Every structure is written in structure tokens, then in C-alpha cells.
Swiss-Prot record:
Protein species of origin: Pinus sylvestris
Entry's localization field: Cytoplasm
Catalyzed chemical reaction(s): 2 superoxide + 2 H(+) = H2O2 + O2
Cystine crosslinks: C58-C147
Keywords of this entry: Antioxidant, Copper, Cytoplasm, Disulfide bond, Metal-binding, Oxidoreductase, Zinc
Source superkingdom: Eukaryota
Function of the protein: Destroys radicals which are normally produced within the cells and which are toxic to biological systems.
Complex and partners: Homodimer.
Pfam assignment, any one: Sod_Cu
Protein name stated in the entry: Superoxide dismutase [Cu-Zn]
Transmembrane segments: none
Gene encoding the protein: SODCC
Length: 154
């Protein structure tokens, strides 16, 4: 299958913007690298959502991508949504550069994330362990600050 590449351009609330790149070699894990700016310092939930629909901004991207019907969790948990990528840690300058490697977000096949949305949230993802009523579905990560649709690159 060779190397697959995809990209998301994030846009949203106020000055939040960024670019996230995805690469996958064969059936191996997907590497996610990105830079996002315009965020408040601290942790922000970072997820793949089920739909690539941004007609109503980030609100129309649906729930977390969850093809296997599991509960929300941390990226290292066995019981997690495929789209649960945890948090990105934003510095005092409002920017974050990150690299994540994950085996549940392929760029091809029946569970491909191509055509789905990536969303950056206002608050930290509690990784399903916060005890809040939303912990097991969204990680209680709050509002959707920015989003974009995953598209294949040549």
C-alpha cells in the first residue's frame, strides 16, 4: 500500500487555527504531527469526530469516531473510541506543536479517518476518568474551538 498522507486545516473560534498532518506506512500506525495557534495555555482535548460535516461549524461533526462502539478513554486504553487522541499541551504563547502515533486511526480501509473531522476542544479531556456525566462519552472536554476535515494528500 505504501505511504499514505493526509492533512487537516483547522479553523474556528476567534484566532484558533492550525495544520495537522497524518502519515501511515502500509498497515502500520498513523503518525499525527501538527501546529495549532490561538489557544489558551494548558491542555485541550484533541479528537477525531465521526463526520466530516462542517456546515454548522464544528457542531455538525458528530460524536467522537467510534466504529467499535466503545466508551471514551485515554489513547493508551484498550476501551476507547478510535478518535480519542487525548490532549495537546499548549504553551504560554498560545501555540502547540505535537506528534502523536496511534494505531486506531488508519488512512485507508473500513475504519479510515479520511473524510472525518478533527476537533480541538476548549477544555482538557479527562480521559474518561473524571467522574462527570460526560466523562465516558466526550471526556468532558468542553466546547469545540476549531475543526477541519481530513483530506488525502498526493
Amino acid at each position: 500500500m505504501g505511504l499514505l498522507k493526509a492533512v487537516v486545516v483547522l479553523n474556528g473560534a476567534a484566532d484558533v487555527k492550525g495544520v495537522v498532518q497524518f502519515t501511515q506506512e502500509g498497515d502500520g500506525p498513523t503518525t499525527v504531527t501538527g501546529k495549532i495557534s490561538g489557544l489558551s495555555p494548558g491542555l485541550h482535548g484533541f479528537h477525531v469526530h465521526a463526520l466530516g460535516d462542517t456546515t454548522n461549524g464544528c457542531m455538525s461533526t458528530g460524536p467522537h469516531f467510534n466504529p467499535l462502539g466503545k466508551e471514551h478513554g485515554a489513547p493508551t486504553d484498550d476501551n476507547r473510541h478510535a478518535g480519542d487522541l487525548g490532549n495537546v499541551t499548549v504553551g504560554t504563547d498560545g501555540t502547540v506543536e505535537f506528534s502523536i502515533t496511534d494505531s486506531q486511526i488508519p488512512l485507508s480501509g473500513p475504519h479510515s479517518i479520511v473524510g472525518r473531522a478533527v476537533v480541538v476542544h476548549a477544555d482538557p479531556d479527562d480521559l474518561g476518568k473524571g467522574g462527570h456525566e460526560l466523562s465516558k462519552s466526550t471526556g468532558n472536554a468542553g466546547g469545540r474551538l476549531a475543526c477541519g476535515v481530513v483530506g488525502l494528500q498526493g
